[in-house]
Amino acid sequence: MQIVEQMKDKALAELNLVKDKKTLDDIRVKYLGKKGELTEMMKLIATLPNDEKPKLGQAVNIAKQALQEAINLKLANFEEQELNEKLAQEKIDITLSGVGQNQGSLHPVTKTLNRIEAFFKQNGFAIEFGPEIESDYYNFETLNIPSHHPARAMHDTFYIDETHVLRTHTSGVQIRTMEKQQPPIRIIAPGRVYRCDSDITHTPMFHQVEGLLVDKDVSFADLKGLLHAFLNSFFEKDLKVRFRPSYFPFTEPSAEADIECVMCDGKGCRVCKHTGWLEVLGCGMVHPKVLKAGNVDPEKYQGFAFGMGVERLSMLRYGIDDLRMFFENDLRFLKQF
């Protein structure tokens, strides 16, 4: 038993001198490996008298356990030391200036849409959507524009086939809403629309918001009041607004709403063509035939509708003079918003 104790003390003494993990592992193998010195001692048990065997086995196990615990402690110290050295080398200097990141922003059309939707939601309007590939029935027929009607010449339409088009307005959403919902109805229908036109003020695809209100005792005065409040809210100033008689097949009477030029405050400039006024939207009282197409009794209910181009309003709000800039993905332009 004494030789086992001496071997343990020798191994522990060697451990105290270890300076690295490799040497530590060499000592582990030397004493605790398959052919280690303490492991070999276990083979001597078979040669001892029966009363001595348990004593040697117990002594060897105690020595192995003590040595293994010492090795584990030494290994933990080495690993902690390595970690501290690594942390010291890789520490973050919080006094250094941070690295800037490019900050994204909303597209001006999206910002304008959000602004329009926020106003009408605050005034009790729901938001409805419809398909961009629309049937001739919903895009024209139900809106008092039959196939022979000259008003179809007002729309440069993309035809998918004989009965389907890329919608030229979101008015079809109004009919779909009236079909599934009884008055009172208050909705706006934002979305993409398509017309075969492209120049400085027109693109083949643009965004439009149309609105519909159907209820009892609705008047043109209600329409004027709502749109005047909207325009003041959108441009954040008390604007002069005028309504000029106009023509739309789906409303009667119909009007165009003009605002005092936001660029020159009505004094006259290139943007307003020196008239002092800017056309911003169309509106009118819903035609009885359109109400009937939506299964609404025109003898019992009245309604008004309005429509506006989102890009048009965005150009006026942000002072943009070319519609095509919205669709060119030029970061020099987009970063300004």
From Swiss-Prot:
MF terms in GO: ATP binding; magnesium ion binding; phenylalanine-tRNA ligase activity; tRNA binding
EC top class, as a word: ligase
Keywords recorded for this protein, A-Z: Aminoacyl-tRNA synthetase, ATP-binding, Cytoplasm, Ligase, Magnesium, Metal-binding, Nucleotide-binding, Protein biosynthesis
Reactions catalysed according to its record: tRNA(Phe) + L-phenylalanine + ATP = L-phenylalanyl-tRNA(Phe) + AMP + diphosphate + H(+)
Binding of Mg(2+), residues: 252
GO annotation, cellular component aspect: cytoplasm
Family membership noted in the UniProt record: Belongs to the class-II aminoacyl-tRNA synthetase family. Phe-tRNA synthetase alpha subunit type 1 subfamily.
Name assigned to this protein: Phenylalanine--tRNA ligase alpha subunit
Gene of this entry: pheS
